[in-house]
């Protein structure tokens, strides 16, 4: 291995901001490794981690409130560059004797940052034509900066929006450079980690793959690994990465539950078994799933039936694989963060063991999670580097229960057939018209109600298909995608004419909230 891709790293201390994961993603986009840890990480752990720089996130609290989160005071004496964002800047200011007060006028949303004094190394290229658009989200502000600090930027409503103490490599911004609404924020974070902290940018897809291959080989040795292959992005990239590392020691189990997209099972087999030489066991279990789901209309019970039966079948197949001692999962970094947060209210060490995927204890298999350090966009980049087809790597999210939660009410084989054909037409047209990559998630929904229609000289009484397409950054909130009327009409016409049993198509224009993205 040519270099240690974890040798240069940034520590992000989380004070509860909704944007903290975005900070980490921006640092990774600068090709620098970073980790999220809780704000109260102790000093010995920080020293052991060995960061080249520290970022203090924003947060919902006020620094002058009783019980407000703080860092260990000696953190600022470590000689490591620190960037405080929003709450992080206020915390640093207060620590050094500055004054933080409630803002006379709160700032939420777009603002214009104006330069004050010398910009210094971090802000040298941040201002263009004497200003820089930024995104604010704060109710407090720094009224008086500490000794040794100078003000670099201000706004109409806040006299102190950016500060620096160049001698001690301490910097603070009241705005959020990590969000898209701060156009030059990505550049500012890149400048901090590359120029201020001195990172050289070793965290690249090629280096990540090389490092992962070495680690997988060291972990697994000559033992066998089994992986539940779903056809989704995460399990597909995990399979390709592990296969590169250990070849035919990997055995994938692909369960076709009858609730997949059109020809998805064949596509998975072509990609992995035929083109890449991965050992894939295909289990055709459509009848078992349809029998188990018969008569069930409750969404949560459907999910449990599908999930439990998948585990049951996976265990049956795994028992037939001799000498398998490892179970591989496509766990990614946000899964680790959310799993830790649900248990403790804090993000935990990325290296700590979390059985995110719910491995049954009695299987007694060791867990292999080669993607657990990566965000979704990094997983996609690695998938492309490994040679996976672009449509597979960049396909929209697909729920674990598959079409089982896109068929409202009871699931029947004929309903699934209608839905997968309608969905395939919809997705095909989104690709053809150039909309697919602009949409975060798009899919068709089968409504188990019949409507009256007219075809030829006769009346019809057939099913309804709903089309859904949303735009979102984080899937926590989402807006409906404004598909042009002409494209809607063409898609509707194709579905009605080509899918037997459908005579009406509707378009879902609900946002999240109040609606969810999926219908069930």
UniProtKB/Swiss-Prot annotation:
The keyword Ligase applies. PANTHER family: GMP SYNTHASE [GLUTAMINE-HYDROLYZING], GMP SYNTHASE-RELATED. This is GMP synthase [glutamine-hydrolyzing]. Residues 203-395 form the GMPS ATP-PPase domain. It comes from Syntrophotalea carbinolica (strain DSM 2380 / NBRC 103641 / GraBd1) (Pelobacter carbinolicus). Disulfide bonds: none annotated. Homodimer. The active site is at residues 86, 176, 178. GO terms for cellular component: cytosol. Keywords: ATP-binding, Glutamine amidotransferase, GMP biosynthesis, Ligase, Nucleotide-binding, Purine biosynthesis. It holds the Pfam family GMP_synt_C. Its EC number is 6.3.5.2.
